[in-house]
């Protein structure tokens, strides 16, 4: 049996709730991600914006798992093939910019702010009341 990217994509192989592109972003191999992303036509472009079991898209995984230039390179590849720069994590509403700032990845955050199409005013789910409630409970 011949092993090919098309076979993996057509059969939708999922490992731990992630598609092939999620796994590539998690491992940070920009060359492999680029090769696989190039083989994706419009019929499979949805894989770029598909959520994993943690409620994250490929772009979020790249920002969480990697920092600086590595994260930026992965995200450039994803955006060039149709990923949504303003896509949100399901449970928090975070965008990739929220993640970069939260993780203090200022290289990525600055790069994102220079991109056209980025929503720098995007709001996520506010956690302020949760933090203040948990602080009061500890007193």
UniProtKB/Swiss-Prot annotation:
One of its GO terms (molecular function) is NF-kappaB binding. It comes from the Viruses. ANK repeats lie at residues 16-48, 54-87, 92-122. Suppresses the host immune response through NF-kappa-B inactivation. Possesses ankyrin repeat domain required for NF-kappa-B binding but lack the regulatory regions required for dissociation from NF-kappa-B and degradation. Therefore, prevents host NF-kappa-B release and subsequent activation. GO terms for biological process: cellular response to tumor necrosis factor; symbiont-mediated suppression of host NF-kappaB cascade; toll-like receptor 4 signaling pathway. Belongs to the polydnaviridae I-Kappa-B-like protein family. It holds the Pfam family Ank_2. The gene is N2. This is I-Kappa-B like protein N1. Gene3D superfamilies: Ankyrin repeat-containing domain (1.25.40.20). Keywords: ANK repeat, Host-virus interaction, Inhibition of host NF-kappa-B by virus, Repeat. SMART domains: ANK. SUPFAM superfamilies: Ankyrin repeat (SSF48403).
